[in-house]
């Protein structure tokens, strides 16, 4: 008598699901290789081997290596546009510039969790002269402006800033300073490069951004 074991039903992936899974495997493998070896030193064969797929499978999903590279940057930029992206959440939930520490900590989370994607930006600058990231940075002020208007931040911030200062410039400046700080700390591996621990540095940077570095007038 044959015994039939009845367990969990087998879940079969559709062709579309299998194809998408392979595509993501390729992108994940390329991210690891591009961010550590660079673009030029990584071949399509390297990506296929890292992904556990054939070279033909890679070409089935992507016509060439540069398309994979662009796909990774697009993946990162798409994540940055989501409401739950740490920076967007911190900016929307707080009141600028009172929430500068929160923004700094959000940027720390981003550079830590998206470290390999941040590295790709440097790869693009070195190996492509910034071709793939130029438009993203060129459109940055417009994106900040749209975000702040959508969340009703612009008018409120105008009332807090010194005369003639742009709310968009103020938020962008603070953001870029924190990105620079955490890129050096996390991506370059230079701990406490302001001569103090990270939390203390975030507090001091926030204080300088809010109040300036000079003593108030007597």
Label every model-predicted segment:
Residues 1-21, 88, 217-218:
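N-terminal intrinsically disordered/low-complexity leader segments
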Residues 14, 21, 25, 29-67, ...:
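Helix-turn-helix
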Residues 36-40, 114, 158-159:
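Short coil/turn segments at alpha/beta junctions that flank glycine-rich nucleotide-binding fingerprints
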Residues 74-80:
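Short, basic, alpha-helical segments at the C-terminal edge of helix-turn-helix-like DNA-binding modules
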Residues 85-116, 121, 167-174, 202, ...:
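Hydrophobic alpha-helical connector segments
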Residues 92, 98, 108-149, 194-195:
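Short secondary-structure transition hinges
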Residues 118, 134, 138, 153-207, ...:
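Hydrophobic/aromatic-rich alpha-helical bundle segments in the mid-to-C-terminal region
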